[in-house]
Amino acid sequence: MLFPLVRASSSKGGIVLADLRYALRQLLRAPGFSATAILTLALGIGANTAIFTLIDSILLYPLPFPQQERLVRIGYGGAQTETAFFPKGWIRAVGDHSSSFAAVSGFGPDTESNVGEAGAPARIFGAEVMTNALDTLAIHPAAGRFFTPEDGIAGHDPVVVLSYGYWQEHFATSPAAIGQTIRIDGVSRRIAGVLPPGVRFPYADTRFLIPVTFKGGDAVDPWLQFNLRAFGRLRDGVTPGLAQAELRGLQKPLLALFPWRMPDIWASEMTVEPLLESQVGSLRPRLLLLFAAVGLILLIACANVANLTLARAAGREREMAIRGALGASTRRLVRQLLSESATLGILAGAVGLFTAAASVRALTRWLPADTPRVQEVSLHWPVIVFAAGASLLAGFLFGLIPALHMARPKLGQALHAGSRSVAGKVGQFRVSMALVVGQIALSVLVITGAGLLLHSLWRLSQVDPGFRANRVVTAEVSLDASACQAKGHCHAFFQTLLERLHGMAGADQWALADSVPLTAQAGSYVYDAEGHPRDARQGALLATARTVTPGYFATLGLTVVRGRLLQDMDLSGATRAVVINQRMAQRLWPNQDPLGRQILHVSDEPQPAVWVPAAALTVVGVVNNTHENGLAGDFADEVYLPLTPAREQPVLYALLRTRTGAQAAAEELRNAVAGLDPHVPVTRVRTLNEVVAASVSAPRSLAVLLLIIGALALAIGGVGVYSLIAYIVSWRTREIGIRLALGAQKRQIVQAVVRQSLMLALGGSAAGLIAAAFAGQLLRRFLFDVRTLDPLTYTLVALLMTLLALLAAWIPARRAASVDPIKTLRME
C-alpha cells in the first residue's frame, strides 16, 4: 500500500509544479498585464503589511520583561493610568497594605538634565525611579548592579544607572565604567549599573535613572513629591481585576494617610490595567482604524486585478475551450487558473514586503515622537507570515471569479471567428461592472472617513486657544537642579535674566514661566477657597497652576476680565497676590465679585480644613480662559502665581513676543543667558505656533494617513473605471462604427460613454456613502465638532467621485468618437 500512496503523492506534487511552471510561462508571455497586476497588488499588500508591522510591534509584541503579563499600572478616577500621579509615600503604602502585588513601585516624569562637566553640559533625558523599580520589572543589569534600599535614603552616596545605549556610546560597553562618576545637574553620581539591551524604561528616550529619595524621620516628605506614576507586579494567580477590587477596598484607608485633604478625584475608584495596555491603549483605536482602511485597499486592488484578469480572459477563451475539448475538467482548469493567480499574489507579496519595509521606515520617522513604542517598530516573523498570508489570500480573491468564468467556455463561440460580438460578452461585462462598482464603493468609504477626519482637524485648528501665538518664541533655560540648594540663587539668576530681556531689541514683550501652554507641563494646585465649605471628610479643590512673571499676560495676549494683572511688586511675595481665570471665578463665586477673595493651599493648613488667613493668597485679577491640555478639551480652573523667592526653580521657560523673527530673538536670548553664565544651556527653542501645531499632532497624523490611503483608493478605483470603460469601448468598436455610419453624432457617442461611466460612479458612490453612514459611528471618538453624517463631507465626496468618473471616461470617450466607420465596415 505504501508505494501507491507515494506514487499518488509524487503525482500530485508533480501536477502542482507543472501548474506553477505553466503559470510562470503564461505571466511571462503577458509582461504588461503581469507588471500592472503585480504593482497594483503590491500596493495593497504593502500597505497592509506596513500597518500590520506597526500593530505587531506596538500592540502585540511583548514588553522586554519576564512575565510581562503580570506587570500593571495603577490609576484613579477612571482616567487613563498614564495621567495618574501619586506621591512616593502612597506607593510605598500600597506595597505594605496590598496582598495582590508582589511589588509596587513608581517612576517620575521624563525630564531633561544637564549631564557632563560644568563647562559643556549636554541636555539628556532621564527619570527618577523608586529603588525597587528595576527589581519589580524582574530584569538583570548588563553590568554592575541596580539600586538598593540604601540608595533611596537622602544623603546617601548619589548613584545612577545608565541605559545600555548611553553606556555603549560613551563608554564603549567597558565594564570599567562601573564606579566612575558623571555629573548630572551639578551632582557627581557614581555609575552603579547598566540596563540590559533593548530595555527602554520608563520612557523611550530615557538615558539614565536616578533613585527617588526619602528623608528619614520626616513625616511629610513622603507626600511632597507628587509626580510619580505607579506600577506593580501581581502575585501568581492574581488578575488585574482582583487587584483593582482590592485597591478599591483599601482606597479610604490609604487616603487617610495623607497629611492633608486630597481632591475629590482621589475619592473615585482606583483602576488597574496591564502595563502594555497602559502604554499603547490610546493608540489601539487609531491603528485598528488604519488597518481596516488598508484592508479595504487590498480588496480594491483585488477587484481591480480581477477585472484585468477578466479582460485578459478574452484572449484565452480559445485556449480554455480547446483544453476542455481535449478532456480537461472544469476543476482542473480552475486549479490551473488559480495557480496563476497565486503566483501573481506571491510575486506581488515579495514586492509588497519591500514596499512595506520602506513605508515603515518613513512612518516611524514621520509619526509624532511621543508615539508609544515607535522606536521598537521592526519586521518580526509574524509580519512575514502575515505578508505571505495576505499574498495567497489576494491571489484567491482576485483569481476565483475569473477562474470560474474562464473555466466554462462555450467551445463553439470560442472557436467562432466572430466571437468578439458584445452579446458574447454581456456576462463578463456584468461581472466587471459589479467589480468596478464595488471598487468605487470601497473607495468612497475610505475617502469619506478621511474627509470627516480632515474636517474635524480643520475645526480643531479653528479653536481659539485663549492666547495669541503669533510671533511668540519659547525656550527652556536650565540651571543645574543643585543650583537651588543655595537659597535664592535660582531666583536671583532669573530675576537678572528678566532685567536683561527688557533691553532686547528683537522683542516687544517678554516673560518667564515654569511651563508653556498646551504642553501639559503645568502643575496642580490643591486648595480651599473662601466662601466654600471646608470639611476634613470632603475633598479639596483642584486647579492647574502656572508660576509666571508679570509680563506673561501681555506676551501671550491674555485679556483682563476683572481687577489687575500681576505686577513687579508681587514678585517679593509680600502681597500674596494671585490671578485666576474666568472658569475658576465663575465656579467658585458665581454672580459674585471674586476680587479680594482668598484661596489657601492645603499644605499651608496646620490641620485639614483649618483656615490660616496669613498663609492665604488674595485674588487680585481675573483673565480669560486658555486651553492647557489640548484644544479639544474643556477649560480647566487655572491659577497664575507670581515667581517669588519661595517658588524658585532651576528650569524656566523664556517667552518672547518678537519683532525681528524667531531665530534672531532666540540668538539674543542665548547671548543674554551667556552673559550671566556661559555654561547654562538654552534649549527647546520653538515658536508658540509650533507648540499649538504639536498639540494636534495625533489627530493630524491620523487624518493625513487616512487621506493618503483614501488617495490610493481613489487612484486604484479610478484606474478600474478607466480600464473597464476603455475595454468596453474596444469591444464595441464595430457597433460604434455602424452607429456612426447610420448617422449617429459623435456627441451622442461621447455622451453614451460618459453616461456609462457616471452610472458606475453613481452606483458605487451611493453604496459607499450608505456604508459610510453606518461605519461613521466607528469614527465618532476621533471627531471634534463634526457629525458622522456631515453634509459638507458627503457632498464633496460625491462631487469628487463624479469628477473622477468624468476623467476616467474622457480618453475612452474621445477614442470612441474618433472611430472611422468606413474602416470599421471595411474590416467587416
Residue ranges and their predicted role:
Residues 1-9, 112, 126-149, 158-288, ...:
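Mid-to-C-terminal secondary-structure elements
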Residues 2-35, 65-66, 77, 112, ...:
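Membrane-helix entry/capping segments
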Residues 11-34, 275-280, 308-335, 339, ...:
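Alpha-helical transmembrane segments of integral membrane proteins
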Residues 31-58, 62, 300-303, 345-349, ...:
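Short, strongly hydrophobic transmembrane alpha-helices
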Residues 43-70, 310, 359-369, 442-471, ...:
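Alpha-helical transmembrane segments
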Residues 51-53, 306, 341-414, 452-455, ...:
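Small-residue-rich transmembrane alpha-helices
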Residues 63-112, 225-231, 273, 460, ...:
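Membrane-proximal extracellular/periplasmic loop immediately following the first transmembrane helix
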